[in-house]
Curated annotation (Swiss-Prot):
GO annotations of cellular component type: cell outer membrane; pore complex
Protein name: Porin-like protein BUsg_347
PANTHER family reported for this sequence: OUTER MEMBRANE PORIN N-RELATED, PROTEIN YDDL-RELATED
InterPro entries per UniProt: Gram-neg_bact_OMP, Gram_neg_porin_domain, Porin_dom_sf, Porin_gammaproteobac, Porin_Gram-ve
Localization annotation: Cell outer membrane
Signal peptide: 1-23
Assembly, per entry: Homotrimer.
Family according to the record: Belongs to the Gram-negative porin family.
Keywords associated with the record: Cell outer membrane, Ion transport, Membrane, Porin, Signal, Transmembrane, Transmembrane beta strand, Transport
Classification of source organism: Bacteria, Pseudomonadati, Pseudomonadota, Gammaproteobacteria, Enterobacterales
Topology within the bilayer: Multi-pass membrane protein
Amino acid sequence: MKNHKSLAILIPMLFAGSTAVNAIEIFNKNGNKLELYGSINPNHNFSNEFLSTKISSKEDNTNAILGLSGKIKITDKLSSYAQIEYKNNFFMPEDLMNKQQPNTVRLGYAGLKYGNLGSIDYGRNYGVIHDAQSLTDHVPYINKKSIFAYNDNYMVGRNHSLLTYRNNNVFGLVDGISFALQYQDEIKNRDLNKGKSSSGWGASLKYESDSGLTAVGSCFTSERMISSNKKDLKNTSVDSYGLGFKYDANNVYVAAFYGSARNLMPYNMHISDSFINETQNIEAIAEYSFDSGFHPSLSYLDSKGQNSNSPKKELDLAKQINISTRYEFNKNVSTYMNYKINLLKENDFISQNQIPTDNTIGAGVVYQF
């Protein structure tokens, strides 16, 4: 793979995260609420070799996201809630889209909440590691290749069959401290290697202060069932923990995340039961918000892995610097530019797993609701 520079023109006309901060309120009466949020993201990439004006490749990743979140008041303290988030890709011919159904349900869960006793829900949701890792996801248009952002990989990113209990302020007794407990039941085809995984448990603890400081710690453990012809393999459990910190006050946003995992990511996507023994992930971001509406930021990502089956003891999974800025016209409309400097160097592992080594320039206009 040649080291080349990629120009990505990203123009999301409607953007909103799953938190639905600027969601459209469809219904709100007597404590019952229904909100709609969504995005449509035209995304086209232009790639060319370094210092060359000739375009070597083009790629269309246009997609749309639509979500609904609702709440129903049952009693003064008891309420039910649900959320579903749906994604569709629009870069395939219509005939193929009808046959292959390139659609994705990103989120889909429902639950109950009772006063200070907390909430409990079940379905497709975020794993507890996301509680800590999300602190460095402050700039949504940066596409980080973090191993702790992969979906359908145990309790990392989004996954299904998650039973989640959350409690804010420790039953109303301690302000600023919240915790979560999570259980994932056994199911086939859960992880990236299309294997079978047994049940697992996870937890997270969060502290927030009035001064803008936040600290989050998350962890999970799960047993992986390997194939019958590999029963002699050791360390079949999948374990991970993450620590996240942020400061958000006085126009300054600074956050960092450290994550460590064992047997989490496949070393070779084409070989069953081949996993990186240990992975470490470091992320950091700093942003300053000017009163005029400009928000320049600088972020860093470094993911490394260790595998006894690899000729190299330490493998670079991702390494990048992002230099970004955005300008907010108002709470709904903003424009941005991002330059990603990819620090990865070509080797057998990167070629084998088709990990990109190109630099990327992204620019776009965002309208969010």
